[in-house]
Design a protein with these regions (language model features):
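Low-complexity, glycine/proline-biased repetitive segments and flexible coils/loops
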Residues: 1-192
Length: 192
């Protein structure tokens, strides 16, 4: 890690940013989540998280790039967003996972990439977990931050899905809705 010399009596601007937002399950076509905002300390900037992709056969279902990338959306096999964007050393985050036709992928975390998904039986497809965040002592105690969000999933009939877990350090779970003639459950992809 790099050091930053703090001078007594000098005021330094600080902005606390955030992760990207999840993408929607249903249409309108091409809709997606929103990117996160940057964190800034004086001359040092850490990029906000990439947005989560939408699902339900929408175009543009790739996750957004950012400090960590958002997870790809299901139905259209969306790719995960690139982490560490723009590139810096040491890296500020990891890639989002790639999605299958049945389940969305997890968003990337500061310490770990989001989990990609495969295409299992259509009535039992869990989303990918989010990547774990990294521990930080900036507040004076050891706290894990910047976890990636859990991905999207589909389950119907007698095969309900299990919520995809967010990564350690604040990664959110996907929200579940019931849709369709078989009361299938779909989870909105969350961001990294």
């Amino acid at each position: 890690s790099k050091s930053f010399k703090v001078e007594p009596g000098v005021t330094y601007p600080i902005t606390v940013g955030g992760g990207g937002a999840k993408g929607p399950v249903a249409r309108p076509a091409g809709d997606k989540g929103s990117p996160g905002s940057n964190s800034v300390f004086s001359t040092i900037t850490s990029a906000g998280g990439g947005y989560g992709a939408g699902g339900s056969q929408q175009p543009g279902t790739d996750g957004g790039s950012g400090g960590s990338g958002g997870g790809g959306g299901y139905d259209a096999n969306g790719d995960g967003g690139a982490g560490n964007t723009p590139p810096v050393s040491p890296p500020q985050g990891n890639n989002g996972g790639d999605a299958s036709s049945s389940a969305g992928a997890g968003g990337g975390g500061a310490a770990q990439a989001g989990t990609s998904t495969t295409s299992p039986a259509p009535n039992n497809a869990n989303g990918g977990p989010g990547g774990d965040g990294s521990p930080s002592t900036i507040s004076g105690s050891d706290v894990t931050r910047a976890g990636g969000g859990g991905g999207a999933g589909y389950g119907g009939g007698a095969n309900p899905i299990t919520r995809a877990q967010g990564g350690a350090g604040g990664g959110g779970q996907g929200a579940i809705t019931n849709e369709g003639p078989h009361a299938g459950q779909k989870v909105a992809a969350t961001a990294g």
